[in-house]
Amino acid sequence: MALPVTLAAEVLLKRVVHRQWEGDPDLLFPSGHVAMATAAALVTVLAVRVAPVAPRLRPVVAWLAGGYVCTIALARLVETVHSLTDLLGGAATGLAVTLGTALAITALVRRGR
């Protein structure tokens, strides 16, 4: 649920902010790659937290997920397709939408009990 909502939020934000490189028609802010990577990483971390997984593996998954997001962000920065603020905006979008989705799902589950 968090990934499609993140995609929708990212597309909406791009149309509202409308930041472009000069001469390039692509919209830049927020970075969709980083938004989706952040959302996927956070969903993974949250899933491992509630799954019957050995507790000692949870920090490993969290570090790997964080490394994945940093790798995607660094690649976008090195390729000069995004500025740092685009990447931070993407991370914030993925984080906010995923946490919001998780809170909404938790509230719905608790209400149904």
Predicted features along the sequence, with ranges:
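Membrane-embedded catalytic cores of phosphoryl/pyrophosphoryl-handling enzymes
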Residues: 14, 21-30, 34-113
